[in-house]
Amino acid sequence: MKINKFLLSFLIIFISNISNSFADEAMMQKGLEIFNGKGQCAACHVLKAAGSQGNIGPNLEQVNMTFESVKHIVTNGQGVMPALGLDGTLNKEEIETVSYLSLIHI
């Protein structure tokens, strides 16, 4: 009986990890679409995963920011960066998705 409980626990954890990796991959793909498209982030920022070589904003491969900090800047703008949330360019879900992407350095 203990073996069955162990196997069941293992399978639950294994399946959960697979589901999370698919969710992460889907979120990353959606983030890339926003980064290179609607958000126009690639025009100003460097991000290897997006194939972007912008030279106006910071290189996102080199900044060390929290998710909340990135989300705040994308929403409200900073310096020459426009407020993509306040001007209606991106909705809340799109801001969270592109903010997540900007933290992934692959």
Kindly give the residue locations of the regions a language model identified.
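Bacterial N-terminal signal peptides that target proteins for export
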Residues: 1-8
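Bacterial N-terminal signal peptides
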Residues: 9-17
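Electrostatic cytochrome c docking/interface patches
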Residues: 17-36, 69
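The canonical Cys-X-X-Cys-His
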Residues: 31, 38-47, 98
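Gly/Gly-Pro-rich "capping" loops immediately C-terminal to redox-active cysteine motifs
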Residues: 42-75, 80, 86
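Conserved small/polar residues in nucleotide/adenosyl-binding loops
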Residues: 104-106
